[in-house]
Amino acid sequence: MTIEQAMELIHGVAWRGSRPGLARVRELLHRLGDPQDGLQFVHIAGTNGKGSTAAMLASILRAAGYTTGLFTSPYLERFAERMQVNGVPVPDAEFAAVCEALQPCIAAMDDPPTEFELVTAAAMLWFRRRGCDVVVLEVGLGGRLDATNVIAAPACAVITNIGLDHTEILGDTLEQIAREKAGILKPGTRAVSYPQTPEVRAVLHEICAQRGIPLTEADAAAIVPLTDGVDGQTFTYRGAEYTLPLLGAHQLRNAAVALETVTALRARGWRIPDAAVRAGLAQVRWPARFELLRRAPWFVLDGGHNPQCAQTGAGNLARYFPGRRITLLVGVLADKDYPAMLAALDGQAAAYIAATPLSPRALPAAELGDYLKRFGKPVTVCADPAQAAELALAHAAPEDVICAVGSLYMAGAIRMDLRRDHNENSGH
């Protein structure tokens, strides 16, 4: 099977969409020989910060000498990013071979799997074939009925920041959403949580008590920021000092979650030296999360796509670029709460460019442009995200800031274009 045929299989029309329930993925994995049963997991659910926390933990575990799988979604530039071993995305030939093994199993099923279930099963088989010591597994959506929840009790279950997103599927209160996410908490695991709101904290404590699961919550008060700038930050947590290249105060809280997860894993006998923890955090890379792509003019890429992310992004712009003229390059999905996102960001914007993310769920740039006019600032409409980025750069003074925000589906196109441009101009 070629990589093209493999992608055709994965993106096949028969299994579009998201249909909650674990029966299909269970059957598919069983037909594959249950590869997940031979793996150890750190399972991560939450609204925001899942990917960043997963990247930190994978980096730390790798630095500690473990062969580490990482499963995340969505991808930015290439599908292969969704499954990595030791920081390297799945090679085309290996992914094609895994998909070839899937094909007869799918054909034998009466109820065909969804695309996400296929990708999850493919990843499990690949991680098993690669002999991973541990897999850092990010939930796709929710937790309880997510395809990743097919695993037995993980070494550690992590709940990152919980907010309102995907309310049409997960429920429209924080308590309902917390119950869905807490579906990954299985007897026999240890749980670690982000510093949550009181109603979320109450749900997690109740469920962990019912299931006999030890729960640790990261302590925001134990984080002491030391230095902070566009190249990264240093901080102490519970007295130990760390360097983190990811920007924003929220990343310090995500790092605290990763550090508490290390403590939970050590309690289960995992050998993770302090030096590996420091090196893992210092080396972590997680693109399109308030990522600085250019200087003079400054170009920041932030894939945040809900009101909570937008508030964080606005705070980061104020923190790192006070007093500068900021153009917001915005692209959103029509089913997101973009009015609340834009209300949170508007205080930082001098001008707007509206673009259309590369997704069938995208809000067309022209419609977004009309909406943005209510803020009374200059609005330009340029549907193609990469062209919109070029336009913004062409009109910016060296000290100005452009921040592309609103959707990971837009971030990938812009990142690819700007990096290609940079490589061409620098002779790489």
Q: Regions from the language model: what does each represent?
A:
Residues M1-N48, S52-T67, L76-R78, R190-S193, ...:
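N-terminal leader/targeting and accessory segments in enzymes
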Residues S18, L22, R26-D37, A63-A152, ...:
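ATP-dependent carboxylate-amine ligase catalytic core
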Residues G38, V134-L137, L145-V158, I162-G163, ...:
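Nucleotide phosphate-binding/pyrophosphate-handling subdomain across enzymes
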Residues P74, Y194-P195, I207-G229, P245-A249, ...:
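Beta-strand->loop->alpha-helix junctions that form or flank phosphate-binding loops
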Residues D110-D111, L118, G131-E138, P154-E241, ...:
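Acidic, Mg2+-coordinating active-site environments of NTP-dependent enzymes
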Residues G131-D133, G323, A397-E399:
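Short, high-confidence coil segments that cap the C-terminus of an alpha-helix
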Residues Y194-T216, V230-G232, W298-L301, P307, ...:
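C-terminal helical cap/extension that packs against the catalytic core
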Residues S407:
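Active-site-proximal loop/hinge segments that shape catalytic or ion-binding/gating pockets
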